[in-house]
């Protein structure tokens, strides 16, 4: 299934890379099941008025200002959370019960793509998991210029009956498979309500590690990476991080962004009513990550729109020592049909279709591809790249397509060069960014 964005950023960030671009930073995340089902459907022993509790939750979101917050069961009291929260970027609700998924994200950073995906399998064996279109969300979050993280929020099937276990494992594998298709080569965060425990051996929660190369923050920091075999249930609010809950966070970096978890905590004591009562039947979890840019590969911001299939040259480039572009080939006419680069070692990266007229430039041994101008526009109500112009270190250029009034120039940092691509394509180039490597 090809996702279509509900939110679009045509050209991320600055028009050109520069020496002042941020190269390191921190990210704090929070996952919280906010118990937002209608009161008649939810007897979870959370005292107090749900409207008041939801306003309190939103005020705590604003107070502690986590960078990325994934919420689950954000159904019929969603507006009250947003009423008191102050994060600048927030997903629009998909609706209350039975229309919505209950999944939303609040963030200090904008995103260039967002998609809601329904579970392919659900079960009512021990609950009403099929009552709403539960599933997961995907967004491509822009943290800084050339720094992107794919963020997944999820709420899997609950219960321990045979049908529940089958559905939940299907849910987990559905997300893992989606990551393998739509997040190839990218840094990834997955956090939310997994309804899974390592000590429940029928739960295949290890799929994110085995299939996607991700790490569980709690397992890494609180259990020294050792999968527990003895169940340790958490109180609510929890007084220890050693116990295991179903709310989890997974992460990985990529060839551009080094990502490392430095902190994990059950935030229960920060999310209490004024009388000390809990606000939800789940312990909220938080984690902190440090990030830094790689010294061997970096990327530009994106230009274009959220259509077509995802591609990335990063995995192939990560295994190369000092890659260099030797031949540039673009195809275009009314729009940009394809982009290709041949490296000095003979590797060829080609993306897009076969239409248009080809334009080729062969670089000298000491000549580098240092800048690329992209222009975009609308075709069939979809944003695509219409034009590319490459400029080398000697000032030579090659171009294809038709220029528009909406353009951005992506310039490699000083001492770096363009050696590959990442983005989305079909018969044409819908979205495009460039991979940089040292000269």
PLM region spans:
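N-terminal, active-site-proximal structural segment of metallo-dependent hydrolase catalytic domains
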Residues: 2-10, 18-83, 290-294
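Active-site beta-strand/loop signature of hydrolases that rely on acidic residues for catalysis
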Residues: 27-34, 57-79, 106, 139-141, ...
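Acidic/histidine-rich helix-loop elements
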Residues: 31-53, 119-131, 157-167
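Preference for well-ordered, secondary-structure-rich cores of eukaryotic proteins
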Residues: 46-56, 80-85, 96, 126, ...
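Structured beta-strand-rich core segments of catalytic domains in phosphoester-bond hydrolases
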Residues: 68-157, 264
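Active-site-proximal segments of metal-dependent phosphoesterases and phosphodiesterases across multiple
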Residues: 156-175, 195-209
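Metal-dependent phosphoester-hydrolase catalytic domains
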Residues: 180-188, 196-296
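Lectin-type carbohydrate-recognition ectodomains
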Residues: 294-439
């Amino acid at each position: 299934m090809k996702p279509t964005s509900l939110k679009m950023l045509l050209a991320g960030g600055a028009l050109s890379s520069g020496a002042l671009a941020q190269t390191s930073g921190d990210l704090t995340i929070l996952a919280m099941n906010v118990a937002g089902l209608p009161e008649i459907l939810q007897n979870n022993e959370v005292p107090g008025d749900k409207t008041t509790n939801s306003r309190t939750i939103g005020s705590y979101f604003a107070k502690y200002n986590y960078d990325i917050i994934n919420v689950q069961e954000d159904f019929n009291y969603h507006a009250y959370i947003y009423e008191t929260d102050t994060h600048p970027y927030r997903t629009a609700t998909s609706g209350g019960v039975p229309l919505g998924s209950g999944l939303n994200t609040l963030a200090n950073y904008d995103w260039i793509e967002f998609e809601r995906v329904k579970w392919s399998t659900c079960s009512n064996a021990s609950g009403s998991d099929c009552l709403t279109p539960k599933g997961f969300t995907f967004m491509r979050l822009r943290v800084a210029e050339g720094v992107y993280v794919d963020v997944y929020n999820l709420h899997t099937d609950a219960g321990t009956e045979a049908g529940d276990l089958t559905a939940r494992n299907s849910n987990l594998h559905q997300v893992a498979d989606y990551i393998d298709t739509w997040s190839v080569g990218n840094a990834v965060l997955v956090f939310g309500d997994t309804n899974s425990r390592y000590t429940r051996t029928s739960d295949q929660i290890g799929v994110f590690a085995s299939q996607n190369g991700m790490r569980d923050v709690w397992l890494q920091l609180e259990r020294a990476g050792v999968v527990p075999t003895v169940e340790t249930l958490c109180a609510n609010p929890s007084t220890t991080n050693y116990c295991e809950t179903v709310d989890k966070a997974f992460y990985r970096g990529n060839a551009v962004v080094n990502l490392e978890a430095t902190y994990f905590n059950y935030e229960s004591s920060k999310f209490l009513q004024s009388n000390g009562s809990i606000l939800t039947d789940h312990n909220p979890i938080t984690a902190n990550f440090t990030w830094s840019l790689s010294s061997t590969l970096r990327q530009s911001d994106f230009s274009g729109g959220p259509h077509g299939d995802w591609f990335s040259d990063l995995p192939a480039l990560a295994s190369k020592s000092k890659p260099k572009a030797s031949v540039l080939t673009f195809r275009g006419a009314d729009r940009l049909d394809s982009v290709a680069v041949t490296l000095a070692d003979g590797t060829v990266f080609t993306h897009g279709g076969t239409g248009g007229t080809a334009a080729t430039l062969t670089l000298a041994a000491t000549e580098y591809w240092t800048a690329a101008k992209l222009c975009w526009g609308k075709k069939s109500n979809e944003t695509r790249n219409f034009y590319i112009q490459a400029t080398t270190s000697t000032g030579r250029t090659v171009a294809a397509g038709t220029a528009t009034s909406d353009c951005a120039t992506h310039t490699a940092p000083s001492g770096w060069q363009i050696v590959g691509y990442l983005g989305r394509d079909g018969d044409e180039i819908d979205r495009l960014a460039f991979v940089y490597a040292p000269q």
